[in-house]
Amino acid sequence: MKILVTGFDPFGGEAINPALEAIKKLPATIHGAEIKYIEVPTVFQKSADVLQQHIESFQPDAVLCIGQAGGRTGLTPERVAINQDDARIPDNEGNQPIDTPIRADGKAAYFSTLPIKAMVAAIHQAGLPASVSNTAGTFVCNHLMYQALYLVDKYCPNAKAGFMHIPFMMEQVVDKPNTAAMNLDDITRGIEAAIFAIVDFKDRSDLKRVGGATH
């Protein structure tokens, strides 16, 4: 099994991005699966262009995109990506699309095809906080998740794809009082646990357990 893992470069005034720093620490194989990690720019269309190149060349069995969600307290596999860009801030090249479809020929939304409930359970078993997230936002993270599912559907129809948000690193919250953070080793360990679940559930259905929200 081959798994492509992506991480964004820093954005929004941050000097580092825990997504990129964490995936650099991943081992070459996890639970027998070959791991390839790539850096993607926090730029709407360019992120998808880079991803497409690697999907076509690597032909992964699964794609796991990782992104920073400052303020979240744990690792959060995303349930759904919507076909809409609505950027509160510009991306790293100044693009700020508002109410713009990501793909004119795409579905209104794509659900993650990764075993998100099993991923949460595996992260919990590693002793780390995690939960299913029901919104990936409307910035580049949602954009890339949507593009990943669209591109996999087009170029690797048997592959799975999805996205997971992670908290700030400790170094990022020194000047952000009362903001949740996690040390880099734990973030990496949580990503490894999630990937272990992706491999473990490659030929079976996801766990059926509560992961919803009331609001």
From Swiss-Prot:
Protein name (Swiss-Prot/TrEMBL): Pyrrolidone-carboxylate peptidase
First-listed, main subcellular location of the protein, grouped into a coarse class: cytoplasm
Upper taxonomic lineage: Bacteria, Bacillati, Bacillota, Bacilli, Lactobacillales
Origin species: Streptococcus pyogenes serotype M12 (strain MGAS2096)
Keywords of this entry: Cytoplasm, Hydrolase, Protease, Thiol protease
Function: Removes 5-oxoproline from various penultimate amino acid residues except L-proline.
Catalytic reaction(s) noted: Release of an N-terminal pyroglutamyl group from a polypeptide, the second amino acid generally not being Pro
Active-site residues, record numbering mapped to chain: 78, 141, 165
Record localization: Cytoplasm
